Amino acid sequence: MKKILFSILAIAALISCGKDDNNSDAPAYSAEEAKTEVKATMDNFYDCLKKANDGGFANFLYNTITKAPGQNQAWFGKLADQFEDQHQGLFTALDDNKRFDFNSFKGTYTWSNVTNSWTKEANTAKIVLIFPATATSTTNNARAEIDNYQDELVMNQDNENVYLPKKAHLFISVDNAKQLEVTLRNVEYKKLGEGFTPTAIDLAIFTNPFTTTIKLAKKEPTIYTLNFNFSSPQGCATGLAGSIKLTSDNLDSFTSFEEAVEFINVVAFQDKFQVIANVDVKSVHKAGKKIADLEGVDFNTYFKAELYKNNRKVADVKVEEDNRGDSDLFFIFSDGSKQRAESYIEDFEEKVENIFKRFFKD
């Protein structure tokens, strides 16, 4: 069962926008065509990862977390440690109040390669850090800014103040080219147990050259929608649109996932390739079962999924028995033939590590 769940999650992650109407009369792909399309989609996904690894943000990140020759810590570690050493009072207040006090941190901080320290100038509008992008940079060619940060004060169950992020905006540029930008437009929270959980999120993250958007919204008292998109100008587009219906708006009333959820609907995409899936959680609960404990083909009773590309059906996704009598997740093609879904992702970890191998070096 764990292997089946892993296959589902991995496939959704890999083929996570097209929102075309798939209820068309276009003929399904033949089995051979379908296999070719699935493999092409996987190859496209790996190509997108390569573009991410070659992008400006990945290079910036690598340079900041990698130890320079003769250094015992990463470059950003050195900058951060020195900043904290020089401004202990700010960090002590942060720990004491359990709050990031934006106003207290405001200022323009400039790194000196001569003194290996930060200097500060007054700035009542924002936090600015000017520094060398790498340990070998001879100029302060990087700039980080936080020009907006707002939080919300709530009380926890012990009547203690808790400050939750509501809005924020920051960016980092190197040689005047933006490498990272985070825009948190809004977050809404609701009490859940001993803490708080987001019920609405509007977030955009730019990591050169990719833009990621995440939007969580409460459409009705018990219905939430999630939209995730990851794309670049180079043609990579991966995303997910999902909805979930809860059995109650009282988030503290649930004792299990099956009790809390009625259904989950998901459309995941990689360019024009789509996975359309739904899970009838209500029926699982009614039957007195747990999703993680579903055995073999019993999974098909509650889980439905189909693959599409360009409005044409590629395959059904079902749990079937293999030639050894073991249950596994299969793609069922138009001629009735089938292939293990795992066969398309069994080397996933190896390929990802190879693409990002510079980050995995000691």
Predicted regions: what is each one?
Residues 31-34, 186, 206-258:
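Contiguous hydrophobic, core-forming segments of folded domains
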Residues 19-136, 332-362:
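Acidic/polar, low-complexity intrinsically disordered N-terminal segments immediately downstream
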Residues 130, 139-148, 180-187, 211-217, ...:
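Short amphipathic beta-strand/extended segments with alternating polar/hydrophobic composition
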Residues 82-227:
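Long, acidic/polar, low-complexity amphipathic helices and coiled-coil-like
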Residues 6-9:
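Sec-dependent N-terminal signal peptides
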Residues 232-332:
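Intrinsically disordered, low-complexity segments enriched in Gly and acidic/Ser/Thr residues
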Residues 1-4, 18-19:
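Positively charged n-region of N-terminal signal peptides that target proteins for export
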Residues 13-16:
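C-terminal motif of bacterial Sec signal peptides marking the signal peptidase cleavage site
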